[in-house]
Amino acid sequence: MLKAFKEFAVKGNALDMAVGVILGASFGTIVKSLVDDLIMPPIGLVLGGVDFSNLFVTLRDGAAPGPYASLAAAKQAGAVTLNVGVFANTVVSFTIVAFAVFLLVRGVNTLRERLEGPAAPKQQACPFCFSKIDVRATRCPHCTATIG
C-alpha cells in the first residue's frame, strides 16, 4: 500500500496539482493585499474618504450601544452587522482572480491551438441543398442526396 501511495504521490499529476494548490493559495493572498491595500483605498478616497473595511450596517446593537467607530469595535461589543465593505472587497478580489484565471485559460488554449493546428471541420455543406451536415454523413438528412 505504501508503494502504491508513493507511485501516486510522485506521479506528475499529483505533484502538479499540489503545486497548483500552493500557488493558488499564495496568489489569493497577493490578490487580497492588492485589493485591500492598493485598489480599495483610492476608490474610498474618491467616494469621500470611505474605508471599505469599516463599511458596515448595524442590525442590532451589542452590549455597548452604537454607533461604533469601526467594524472591530462593533464586533467587540457583540453587535450584529452586515459587513458591506468586507463583501465589496471580496467581490473585487474574486473578480481579479476570475479575470486572471480567464487570461490563463485563454493563453493555454491559444498556445494549444498553435501547437496542434486548426481543428478538423465537423460539418460540411451539402453540395445539393447547401445545408450543414456532419462530415461523416453519406446522405443529406435535408434533401436525401447521396454525399460522395
Curated annotation (Swiss-Prot):
GO terms for molecular function: mechanosensitive monoatomic ion channel activity. The chain crosses the membrane at residues 15-35, 84-104. InterPro entries: MS_channel, MSC/AndL, MscL_channel. Gene3D superfamilies: Large-conductance mechanosensitive channel, MscL, domain 1 (1.10.1200.120). Pfam families: MscL. GO terms for cellular component: plasma membrane. Its main location: membrane. It is found in: Cell inner membrane. Belongs to the MscL family. Channel that opens in response to stretch forces in the membrane lipid bilayer. May participate in the regulation of osmotic pressure changes within the cell. Homopentamer. This is Large-conductance mechanosensitive channel. It comes from Nitratidesulfovibrio vulgaris (strain DSM 19637 / Miyazaki F) (Desulfovibrio vulgaris).
